[in-house]
Every structure is written in structure tokens, then in C-alpha cells.
Design a protein with these regions (language model features):
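Residue-level signal for mature regions of secreted extracellular proteins and peptides
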Residues: 10-11
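C-terminal motif of bacterial Sec signal peptides marking the signal peptidase cleavage site
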Residues: 14-16
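A cross-kingdom marker for long, charged
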Residues: 20-60, 64-358
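Bacterial N-terminal signal peptides that target proteins for export
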Residues: 1-7
């Protein structure tokens, strides 16, 4: 009877989530055979070194489980907002690693991401531990919530001489980092969490506070005409470029960067940087350099109320960037405690600008 109840609960949760999250990602990315990789820089060497150290910490069986062919598009697309009980991952589960292996994985994450990015992954996993505790506390089944249910995988062997990909994720988190020598693409990247208020390191922390503060400051800087262009609706909407939207392009909406004063442009850049700063310094700087160059063609749109804090959807759309912040009602109905957030460069998902066969 309990098995039937658990199965029914997972089906009901999957059905509810699907109304909020869209389809599973499908990737059609034929890989070129003549990819030229520029000489590696110190960041690339450091990342590959950390990846090699993690792989050396594994048994032969574990290495077999964590490594996939670089052209494996099924694995490339294997990320989701769903917990693992609804959307099974492949690779190695964090909870199955020993202390030494987890330390090596943490070191790898610390090279791929910034300190801010590492902190975000830890906060999101802490939120999932809290969600697991709240779900199991009522006696019902849990669809594999918790920090043990986050997975690591590689497409291709880490190398400074040929492209490869690193994946880490689970419920509400997907890091998809494609590397080719000194270049990297972090698109697509899913962040967010539930609950967003967590106790971490002895302090109560709101996971997305920095990016929400930046968005609110930008919105407050707009004059009435600019604000009329920015505000697109009075209720939060769902992700537009979430899982299942590989290859999708969207028309920009909202107030255009070229209509902003210089101080307002900087405030818009702050919105973008709050998310992009989760990348390591090299790749965050490269992304922001491109964003600054194109800020006049970058748009900001807002859907929802200004209060309460965190209850509105917003989107930044530029030639090479789309950022989304999407509050969710699923759970206890509090929009401010559950968010699905996306970063994409639709021109370079999974490094397709360099890798795709023409």
C-alpha cells in the first residue's frame, strides 16, 4: 500500500510541476570534427587539473559511471528543475561519494564557479535539505529531495586540448559548463530554490536577495515613461526559456537599454552581474564585457507587483543573453519562497557557436 501511495504522490507532483516548468530539454547538436582549440590559459589549466584530481579519486566503476561521450546529446540534455525521484539523472550521486571524493568535487566546483557561485550551490542544497525535512516530517514520501541527490557528470575527458563538458545539478540547479581551451559557455544554467529563506552557517539567508535587490533598484530608477515600457503585466509568468527550449529564440520585451541614462545602464548591468558573477572570474568578465558592449540593445521586462519582495517575474534579453527570474506558487503558495531562474545565451547553448557542425 505504501508503494502505491509513493508512486501516486510522485505522479501527482510531476503533474503539478509540469504545469510550471515545461518540457524536458531535447538537444540536437551535431558536433564538428574539425574543432580548433586555442592554447589553454591559467584558468583552463586550473579547471582541468581539478577535474583530473576528482576523476583520480574515483574507482574504475565510478569513472565509468561519470564519463560520457562528448557527442552524447541525451546526457547533455539530462537536467531539469524536477527532483531526482521524478527526473532521474545519470552520473555519480553526491551522496554516494566518500569524504575524499566530495572534497575533490568541492574543489572542482570552486574552480568552475566563483565563491559566490559555490555559495549559491550550497545554499540551494541546504534549501533542498530543508524541503526534504518538511516533506518527510508529515509522514508522506519524499521524491528524493536533499543535498545527497545532486549529480556530477562529464561529457568527454577533461582536457586543455579538446572540448569537454562538466555537469552538476539536481532539484532547482543545473550547471552545464562547456569548455574549449580558454573559452567556456555556462548556457543553459538553472538556479533558484525552495524555500528561498534558509538557515546556513548559523544565519538566516534569502538565497536570491542580491539579484532581487538589483532588479528592484533598477525598476525604481525608471521615470514614468520608461517604467510604462518595462512593466508588461501585473502577474508573474512562467519561464520562457526553461528546460525544453533549446534552440528557441524570443523577441525582447520591456524598456530598451538605449533609452536609459548612464546611471540606469549601470543599474541594469548590476542586475545581470548578480547572476553572471556565479561563473569563475575569467568567464564572468568575458560575459560582462560582451553584455556591456551590447547594453543599448538589451531590454528589461517586469511582470507582477513590486511588493511583496520577490513576487514578480523579470527578464533581461540581449543579443547574447537571456536572464529570467520566475516566482512559483507550487508548494505552500508563497511566491516569494520558490523560484525557477534561467540563464541562457541562445546563440551559444552548450558551446554550439563553436561546436555545431554546419
Amino acid at each position: 500500500m505504501r508503494c502505491s501511495w509513493e508512486l501516486l504522490s510522485l505522479v501527482l507532483l510531476a503533474s503539478a510541476c509540469s504545469r510550471f516548468m515545461g518540457d524536458q530539454e531535447k538537444v540536437d547538436l551535431p558536433i564538428r570534427q574539425d574543432i580548433k582549440v586555442d592554447p589553454a590559459d591559467p584558468t583552463a589549466q586550473k579547471i582541468v587539473g581539478a577535474a583530473d584530481a576528482f576523476l583520480r579519486s574515483l574507482s574504475d566503476q565510478q569513472r565509468k559511471a561519470v564519463l560520457f561521450a562528448f557527442n552524447d546529446n541525451s546526457q547533455r540534455a539530462k537536467w531539469s528543475n524536477f527532483p531526482n525521484g521524478i527526473f532521474p539523472r545519470s552520473g555519480l550521486k553526491r551522496g554516494d561519494l566518500n569524504a575524499q571524493q566530495n572534497a575533490a568535487l568541492d574543489q572542482l566546483l570552486a574552480t568552475v564557479l566563483s565563491d559566490k557561485g559555490v555559495r549559491n550551490t550550497r545554499l540551494q542544497m541546504a534549501a533542498d535539505d530543508a524541503l526534504k525535512a518538511s516533506e518527510s516530517g508529515g509522514g508522506g514520501p519524499s521524491p528524493n529531495f536533499g543535498s545527497a541527490n545532486y549529480y556530477v557528470s562529464f561529457l568527454g575527458m577533461p582536457s586543455t586540448e579538446h572540448p569537454w563538458m562538466f555537469q552538476f545539478g539536481g532539484h532547482h540547479l543545473a550547471i552545464n559548463a562547456t569548455f574549449a581551451g580558454p573559452r567556456a559557455s555556462f548556457s543553459p544554467m538553472l538556479t533558484g530554490g525552495q524555500p528561498l529563506t534558509v538557515n546556513y552557517g548559523g544565519q538566516k539567508t534569502y538565497i536570491t536577495k542580491e539579484e532581487l535587490d538589483a532588479a528592484r533598484s533598477f525598476l525604481a530608477s525608471l521615470d514614468p515613461q520608461q517604467k510604462a515600457a518595462a512593466v508588461r503585466g501585473n502577474a508573474a509568468i512562467q519561464l520562457v526559456l526553461g528546460p525544453g527550449e533549446y534552440g528557441t529564440t524570443i523577441a525582447p520585451e520591456g524598456v530598451r537599454g538605449s533609452s536609459l541614462q548612464e546611471q540606469q545602464k549601470q543599474l541594469l548591468l548590476n542586475v545581470i552581474q548578480a547572476r553572471v558573477d556565479q561563473f569563475n572570474a575569467r568567464d564572468a568578465n568575458a560575459t560582462m564585457t560582451e553584455v556591456r558592449r551590447e547594453i543599448g540593445d538589451t531590454y528589461f521586462g517586469w511582470w507582477g507587483p513590486e511588493q511583496p519582495f520577490g513576487a514578480a517575474y523579470y527578464r533581461v534579453t540581449g543579443p547574447h543573453i537571456v536572464l529570467e527570474y520566475s516566482p512559483q506558487k507550487l508548494g505552500n503558495g508563497d511566491l516569494t519562497e520558490h523560484a525557477h531562474n534561467m540563464y541562457r545565451d541562445p546563440t551559444n547553448d552548450y558551446g554550439s557557436a563553436w561546436l555545431k557542425a554546419r
